[in-house]
């Protein structure tokens, strides 16, 4: 019985590729040598030793073939091989062939010219391999290189795209251990190496299964979303039959079942921002079509919004005031979380829902926001600003109006109507719209201004109303002039509150701020700026836990340089339960407002405090991965 054939070695392939009996270049053998070099873990160092021996052959044809193999490998084998060629150990073997002190007197001019041509082409194409350039310059100084050779067109090769990493060997520690075990001659080490290889292969198989599962799930979501959207739009035009309604209902139920699947996929997607962005987009589409079905087919309200109320002009509070010119406010007041009144469309609703967290699932959109205390801006690196208004010992600079400029706005009780909340917000924003001269007057000495509702503001946003003009006249001793240039005291954020539901996500990928101990904090950037405040960036801070223990007493604080201002609105909670992949997990979201009127490069310092088990963590760090300030108005 014939013994089983062993796989061909690199040495056998190089012998066949450089055989002196070859009538012409054996490109099949050359390419197979390059392919195996890429596949073998120890391929590059072994290949350079074999090539050095062949290049020093006294037979010119064998040496020329070896140099052709070397040139081909440099063009197709990537950085690992470049690093081996760029070592003095291999370069010295080439220098021996061209130097008269060694083999130069016995080497043909054709071989020496080819070596010098290769060295020069590598200095041009691989400037990062400095040792190659040093070797070539040394040959110049010794007079071996009289002038730079003229390179043929195919000598200056474009660098190949980076080869995809073999994930099995990405773990540096395991790779080093495996290399050490394979070099050992002890049977125990070889058995350990075999076991380690099996473990690494199994890990890679699990990773590939996760990727396949994610791709299939996203594809299924996109197909269901597309079909359900078409059927819902057809239903809204009155062209749907009873059978199509049953199909719509089935598609809707299928979309609902895909929500926890997307969340689990996001939980398994650890640090792959590109894959996470695909999941975000799929969930955004899923949420949009679910809300569209509820509104147009069932006629249900979605987060206080019904199709019947989605009429022109019935937009959210901030959009109602988009026509007003809001100069930087100079007053302070307690931050009051407001609830959205009406949404303009299902697209706005779904976009805001999709921004709430990294995983975008089960984030408690209907949970009541805890009442906030007085917020204060961060005045520098020494002051961390948090949602409860507490800071370090350095007090913030005094604002021009005192705190008693108007009655503090109380958090609306659960039974209050949405219009009352919007009217209160309308009054607040109207006072912000006053010029700085009018805000310098102490309000307690004036007669209270008539309370304008949000609808009044909407109808009069294009031109100042007589009431507003009289208000300016009675409160300002001088006629208002052009608004002055913004100063550090005029871009306060304390009177601005952005409802989470009104935020739309941008196309920028989220930034991971903190990811340790199973606790993850991310920054999501809003697409639209605040009306009249293009210097303000709206960020949603998302906190999610995959830890096996509950996380309590979570506090996120932030600070920026003194030329900027930062404010954190109250978080949606301070505790996260232990992670359970079966049930929908909780998450914490918090709106961060960042004012940067001078458009400086942003560097934010954060402090994160939380308790996990019996241990309290106090983490600090910096974040500078913000969009360029000049693009804040159109992310």
Swiss-Prot record:
Biased composition (Low complexity): 313-325, 459-476
Cited function: Plays a role in protein sorting and trafficking between the trans-Golgi network (TGN) and endosomes. Mediates the ARF-dependent recruitment of clathrin to the TGN and binds ubiquitinated proteins and membrane cargo molecules with a cytosolic acidic cluster-dileucine (DXXLL) motif. Mediates export of the GPCR receptor ADRA2B to the cell surface. Required for targeting PKD1:PKD2 complex from the trans-Golgi network to the cilium membrane. Regulates retrograde transport of proteins such as phosphorylated form of BACE1 from endosomes to the trans-Golgi network.
Region (Unstructured hinge): 299-505
Location of the motif Autoinhibitory: 357-361
Any Pfam family: Alpha_adaptinC2
Organism, scientific name: Mus musculus
GO biological process annotation, one example: protein catabolic process
Signal peptide positions (record): none
Modification note: Phosphorylated by CK2 and dephosphorylated by PP2A. Phosphorylation of GGA1 allows the internal DXXLL motif to bind the VHS domain and to inhibit the recognition of cargo signals. Ubiquitinated.
Spans annotated as Disordered: 305-349, 362-422, 455-490
Name assigned to this protein: ADP-ribosylation factor-binding protein GGA1
């Amino acid at each position: 019985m014939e013994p089983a054939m062993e796989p061909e070695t690199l040495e056998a392939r190089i012998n066949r590729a450089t055989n002196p009996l070859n009538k012409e270049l054996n490109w099949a053998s050359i390419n197979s040598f390059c392919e195996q070099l890429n596949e073998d873990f120890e391929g590059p160092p072994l290949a350079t030793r074999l090539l050095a021996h062949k290049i020093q052959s006294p037979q010119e044809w064998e040496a020329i073939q070896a140099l052709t193999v070397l040139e081909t490998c440099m063009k197709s084998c990537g950085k690992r091989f470049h690093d081996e060629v760029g070592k003095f150990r291999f370069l010295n073997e080439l220098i021996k062939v061209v130097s008269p002190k060694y083999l130069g007197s016995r080497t043909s001019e054709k071989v020496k010219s080819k070596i010098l041509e290769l060295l020069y082409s590598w200095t041009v194409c691989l400037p990062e391999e400095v040792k190659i350039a040093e070797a070539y310059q040394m040959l110049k100084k010794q007079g071996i290189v009289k002038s730079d050779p003229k390179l043929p067109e195919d000598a200056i090769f474009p660098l190949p795209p980076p080869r995809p990493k073999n994930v099995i060997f990405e773990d540096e520690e395991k790779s080093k251990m495996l290399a050490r075990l394979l070099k050992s001659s002890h049977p125990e080490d070889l058995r350990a190496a075999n076991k380690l290889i099996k473990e690494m292969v199994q890990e890679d198989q699990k990773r590939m299964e996760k990727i396949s599962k994610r791709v299939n799930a996203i594809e299924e979501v996109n197909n269901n979303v597309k079909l359900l959207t078409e059927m819902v739009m057809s239903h809204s035009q009155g062209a749907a039959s009873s059978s199509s309604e049953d199909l719509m209902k089935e598609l809707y139920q299928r979309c609902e079942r895909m929500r926890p699947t997307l969340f689990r996929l996001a939980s398994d997607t650890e640090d792959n921002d590109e894959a996470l962005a695909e999941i975000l987009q799929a969930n955004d589409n899923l949420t949009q079509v679910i809300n569209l079905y509820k509104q147009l087919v069932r006629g249900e309200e979605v987060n206080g919004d019904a199709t019947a109320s989605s009429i022109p002009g019935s937009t959210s509070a901030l959009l109602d005031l988009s026509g007003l010119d809001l100069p930087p406010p100079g007053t302070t007041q307690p931050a009051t979380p407001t609830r959205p009144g009406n949404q303009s469309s299902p697209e706005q609703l779904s976009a805001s829902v999709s921004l709430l967290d990294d995983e975008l699932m089960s984030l408690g959109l209907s949970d009541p926001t805890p009442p906030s205390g007085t917020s204060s801006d961060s005045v520098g690196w020494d002051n961390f600003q948090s949602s409860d208004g507490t800071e370090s010992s350095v007090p913030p600079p005094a604002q021009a109006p005192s705190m008693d400029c108007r009655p503090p706005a109380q958090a609306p009780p659960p039974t209050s109507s949405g219009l009352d909340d919007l009217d209160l917000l309308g009054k607040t924003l109207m006072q912000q719209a006053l010029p700085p001269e009018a805000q310098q007057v102490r309000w307690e000495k004036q007669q209270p201004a008539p309370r304008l509702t949000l609808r009044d503001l909407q109808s009069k946003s294009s031109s100042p109303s007589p009431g507003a003009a009289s208000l300016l006249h009675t409160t300002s001793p001088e006629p208002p002039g052009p608004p002055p240039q913004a100063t550090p005291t005029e871009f306060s954020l304390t009177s601005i509150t952005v409802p989470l539901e009104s935020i739309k996500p941008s196309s920028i990928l989220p930034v991971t701020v903190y990811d340790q101990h199973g606790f993850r904090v991310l920054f999501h950037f809003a697409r639209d700026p605040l009306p009249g405040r293009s210097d303000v960036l709206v960020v949603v801070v998302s906190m999610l836990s995959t830890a096996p223990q509950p996380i309590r007493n979570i506090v996120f604080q932030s600070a920026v340089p003194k030329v900027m201002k930062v404010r954190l609105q109250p978080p949606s909670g301070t505790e996260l339960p232990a992670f359970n992949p079966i049930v929908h997990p909780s998450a914490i979201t918090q709106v961060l407002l960042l004012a940067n009127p001078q458009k400086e490069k942003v560097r934010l310092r954060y402090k994160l405090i939380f308790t996990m088990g019996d241990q309290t963590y106090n983490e600090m760090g910096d974040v500078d991965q913000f969009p360029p300030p000049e693009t804040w108005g159109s992310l």
